[in-house]
Amino acid sequence: GDVYASYSTYTHYSASDLVKNMKDTYTEYYNDENSKVNEMTDGTVKAKDGTEVTYLVIQLTSYDMDRTEVLLVYPTGEDVVTCSISYWDKVDKVDAQKLCETFMDAIEIK
């Protein structure tokens, strides 16, 4: 399936606050007759520079399509940089470490 990645910066957020916020957002947003969150898992991986990156994996169904969303959250002092990766498909085994290397280590985070 297609993979779509986008980056954002959130100021004055901690990684844990942002992940909690995202969990709530997904739970509320994908909660009607057409869509639902099936499963959410989170944890941490290490970026190349040793920074602890928090990840959130969301398995959801929307209009009979299974989708997998992965959020990587990289803290930079007072802010966090996020990379949101969307698969228009169900991904059974998400390798967060590999995604971190592909998407986070590839960009220059100041």
Report the location of each language-model feature:
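Serine/threonine-rich, low-complexity intrinsically disordered segments
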Residues: 11-13, 46, 56, 109
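Short linear sequence elements within intrinsically disordered, low-complexity coil regions
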Residues: 12-18, 31-35, 79, 92, ...
